[in-house]
Amino acid sequence: MSLKSLEKETELPFDEYVLNDKWRHKYTPIDTYFKFHQQAIENLESFWESVAKELEWFKPWDKVLDASNPPFYKWFVGGRLNLSYLAVDRHVKTWRKNKLAIEWEGEPLDESGYPIDRRKLTYYDLFREVNRVACMLKCNFGVKKGDRVTLYLPMVPELPITMLAAWRIGAITNVVFSGFSADALAERINDSQSRIVITADGFWRRGKVVRLKEVVDSALEKAPGVENVIVLPRLGLKDVPMTEGRDFWWNRLMQGIPPNTYIEPEPVESEHPSFILYTSGTTGKPKGIVHDTGGWAVHVYATMKWVFDIRDDDIYWCTADIGWVTGHSYVVLGPLLMGTTEIIYEGAPDYPQPDRWWSIIERYGVTILYTSPTAIRMFMRYGEAWPGKHDLSTLRIIHSVGEPINPEAWRWAYRVLGNEKVAFGSTWWMTETGGIVISHAPGLYLVPMKPGTNGPPLPGFEVDVVDENGNPVPPGVKGYLVIKKPWPGMLHGIWGDPERYVKTYWSRFPGMFYVGDYAIKDKDGYIWVLGRADEVIKVAGHRLGTYELESAFVAHPAVAEAAVVGVPDAIKGEVPIAFVVLKQGVTPTEELRKELREHIRKSIGPIAEPAQIFFVTKLPKTRSGKIMRRLLKAVATGAPLGDVTTLEDETSVEEAKKAYEELKAEMAGP
């Protein structure tokens, strides 16, 4: 069946151009930008080579791009480098030696509202710690080039330190998000064939202790290949189970390693894997996405410069958990490659009060904020008073990541957080791309902003929107997002499964990388990513994207957040239902429910009218802020909930169940 546009797309502001005086000196005409972009595409290898030369290589490459065996592309073939050296050593040789690299804040606050746990690390501190941990891995446990090291750690400085230490000796990191279950952890350990795991006794989350070591112990019952476990005493718990001969305390190991220890960085090949990161598919077991070293470094370095316009006095904060790819690229590697100062925070965004993030921005003078649309929508619900209590005037750039941002959330953040003076962009990329692909780029050429768009593709990335047959669609028509040429940060494959790599990404449209997202390209060349193509509700043959419906809900002045899922229907095949969180002070009524139905009919069309609307006070989300729509669908269909270990707040599911049962009973009548 051919892909059809909706009768009426969600109202997207294709022609709403936002300018502000603070950035006027940076503005570039759209056609000027695309001329530069086209030149980069036509001279792809020389373009990326010029970027790569800005980094230090132990040995230069012999060939920029080896395309002899597509889709197994190789970048900077013959070149040798080391990520730890690039992120730490080279700064220690300069004035940045005593510059702050990381300011870390734990979740607990004292009675005055000041953080109890704070740490500051200069680039020299980081250099010393990375070398000591590299020695711990290499000298104590024999970790060598190519070995996989699994890290199951919270958001503490030891996580980026250990990643850099592993890369220093040529090991491959396998970071597992600390919210994953024992089964999920075991699966990732086994697939990567890790023989060492690094974890912590626990950490703070919403004022509660989350124990980690016990999860590791349960996982290792199903992962017999692990020989050693290193345990960081984050909380100093006294009752942590330790297996003699296998488990070791981090601090005791480090006591035997002198502060001036130096481990020579391993000069690894450009195509040497730096990390494996597992990402869930719609079917089957998680995919172990593999990224190389040289191409990934060049991609992340370039996009940090272009997208974030890094300056020497910036205080940068990416709120992502390091267990996700955003944390790998834009918490660990990117800011340290640039020699900037960054914030790392352990806890929940709205604990103990909804202004926790705003207090952090004010306390440290954050200038660049990189966060998620889900977080922005959550803060919208709390209202403008909370950010209004704090001085956010240091912010000059805000970017979002992780999912499409609806225009209403964009406008709110731009006005309330940025005081209409920031450069604001919605970046698009994914685990497989390794770094940002589509975004406004205030560090390069800043074209006019549009609320809700991802902006134009960055230089060196040939992005298009195509139909079912792989042909480009006209401006304003929905299609599939693809990348037409290889790029440096692209995945190196799927760990141990090259056939799955080809089938998943390269078979749908031969010669093009299939992203799996719907998108629209407007007449100016800006890309509007609409969400996953598999997050589609098919109503009587019409395809409705969940993003389109949710954006329409949030555009209503009473709505803070919304999640839409499809449920089976005997006549239409499938119909949408919505779980809606109202703004504070708004009362849920039947009249409002009718008003929202009519609002959706007007915004999208009668075909999109939800069969049911449930009012809830919270949506089920992961700790990284992503809405767990599958749980809502399970509630509505009576299906098993499945794995809920990444769920931030279990009461959100119970509330959804209650709302569903109450409305169902009400509709059934006496």
From Swiss-Prot:
Reactions catalysed according to its record: acetate + ATP + CoA = acetyl-CoA + AMP + diphosphate
Binding locations of CoA: 205-208, 326, 601
Domain of life: Archaea
Binding sites annotated in the UniProt record for Mg(2+): 554, 556, 559
Cofactors required: Mg(2+)
One annotated GO molecular function: metal ion binding
Post-translational modification: Acetylated. Deacetylation by the SIR2-homolog deacetylase activates the enzyme.
Residue numbers of N6-acetyllysine PTMs: 626
EC category name: ligase
Protein EC: 6.2.1.1
Positions that bind ATP: 402-404, 426-431, 517, 532, 543
Keyword Magnesium on entry: yes
Alphabetical list of InterPro entries matching this protein: Ac_CoA_lig, ACAS_N, AMP-bd_C, AMP-bd_C_sf, AMP-binding_CS, AMP-dep_synth/lig_dom, ANL_N_sf
Bilayer-crossing regions: none
UniProt KW keywords: Acetylation, ATP-binding, Ligase, Magnesium, Metal-binding, Nucleotide-binding
GO biological process terms held by the UniProt record: acetyl-CoA biosynthetic process from acetate
Entry function: Catalyzes the conversion of acetate into acetyl-CoA (AcCoA), an essential intermediate at the junction of anabolic and catabolic pathways. AcsA undergoes a two-step reaction. In the first half reaction, AcsA combines acetate with ATP to form acetyl-adenylate (AcAMP) intermediate. In the second half reaction, it can then transfer the acetyl group from AcAMP to the sulfhydryl group of CoA, forming the product AcCoA.
Record NCBIfam families: Ac_CoA_lig_AcsA, PRK00174.1
Record family assignment: Belongs to the ATP-dependent AMP-binding enzyme family.
Protein name: Acetyl-coenzyme A synthetase
Gene of this entry: acsA
